[in-house]
Curated annotation (Swiss-Prot):
CDD domains: ThiG. One of its GO terms (cellular component) is cytoplasm. Its main location: cytoplasm. Keywords: Cytoplasm, Schiff base, Thiamine biosynthesis, Transferase. Belongs to the ThiG family. This is Thiazole synthase. It is an enzyme of class 2 (transferase). The active site is at K95 (schiff-base intermediate with dxp). InterPro entries: Aldolase_TIM, Thiazole_synthase_ThiG, ThiG.
Amino acid sequence: MLRIADKTFDSHLFTGTGKFASSQLMVEAIRASGSQLVTLAMKRVDLRQHNDAILAPLIEAGVTLLPNTSGAKTAEEAIFAAQLAREALGTNWLKLEIHPDARWLLPDPIETLKAAEALVKQGFVVLPYCGADPVLCKRLEEVGCSAVMPLGAPIGSNQGLETKAMLEIIIQQSTVPVVVDAGIGVPSHAAQALEMGADAVLVNTAIAVADDPVMMATAFRLAVEAGVLARQAVPGSKSSQASATSPLTGFLEALA
C-alpha cells in the first residue's frame, strides 16, 4: 500500500497519457497496468468539452487524475496552469513540471522550487518532476511537497536509471514518497527502481510506443509487483568472494 498525502494506492505504477495511437488503446493499456494514478498534460485537454477524447475515458475508468504543467517554462506559467487545472478538474493534486528547453526537457530546479513553495501555500498537493539532485529533493520536501519525482534519464529516452547513484541518496534521505519519473524504458528498469527503495515509478513512453502497449503495460505491472516483493523480502548482502551454496566437505569425507 502506498500513501501520498490524503490518498492510498494499491499499485506502485503510475502512468501517463501521451503518445498513444488512440484514446481507446490508452485506456486499455492503463487498465492492464493496474495503475490508479494517471497524469495528463493540461495543454492537451480541451476543458470546454466534457467529452474530451483524453479526459472523458479516464474519468469513466475511475482512475485518480494527476494534471501536470508540462509546457510551462517559468514558475508563473506553472502556477497559472495549476490554478486552471484545479478549477476545471476539481482536484488540488498536481504534477509540477517546468522545463524551458524543448530539446532536452530537463526540469528547471530554480523555477520548480519557486513554484512548489507557492503552490503548497495555495493548498495544492504538489508532486514535482525534478532532476536527481539530493539537495533539491530535500528542499522540495522541506517546502511541503507531498512526494518528489526525480528523473532516471531524460523524458522519453528509455535509457533507464542513468542517475542510479543519486537516486539511492534521494531514497535514503527522503521522508516523503520517491517516484522515479522519466527515462524508464523496459520493465526491468521499473523493477530495479522499486528494489532500490523507490515508492513508485511513472511510465509513459515505454508503454505507449511499444508494438503492443497493452502487453507492455501488463509486463510493467508484473515487474513493479516483483520489485516491491523483492524489496520486502530483503535481498542478501553483496560479497566480493564466492560462497558455495552446496558445501562438499561432508560428502567428500563420507567417500573417504
